[in-house]
Amino acid sequence: MDYAEMVGRLKKSGEDIIAGWTPLHASRAHMLTGIYDEYMEVTEALILLEGVAVDLGNTVELAKELGDLMFYLIGLAQDYHIEAQVLAYPLPEPSRDALQSMIATTTMVKRHLYYNKPLDTLELAVSIRKFIANVASLAAGTGRTLEDILDLNQEKLLGGRYKEGKFSDEQANDREDETLDT
């Protein structure tokens, strides 16, 4: 058996994945995908700043991506009904390994959604809080607070993309607030 054939046999079918799903499962999968995507965009923004003197002017893109990441983290917390625990202050001290908090969060949710593993929501809340602490630390590195990042994201979404305060596929695809569609 070659590798591609093995993958074809072992990957879980879409039918099996969604067999027991509800709309809430789909929303959680959407948030999970968004977290991964935005984390990669934050990483790209950080790479572009490598070797550059950081100031408020040249960190706008990073700040926007941090806001987008927060959108999906809070959306996931809402889907698991742990928003209040996740947003409680004070946040834990940021760790030196932001990637580890992202991996822990996404792995827990992936296993819950796709492998039907029971999920400990307290453990998830702790993991998301660690993740948010790292977002806050990155925000501080741009001269902004976490609240500044949230305000910037809200301004971007409600002031431009979703002017009516409601999601639509059309508005999600017609991004007037971005010059490059990524």
Predicted regions and their residues:
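Flexible "arm" and connector segments at domain edges
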Residues: 1-182
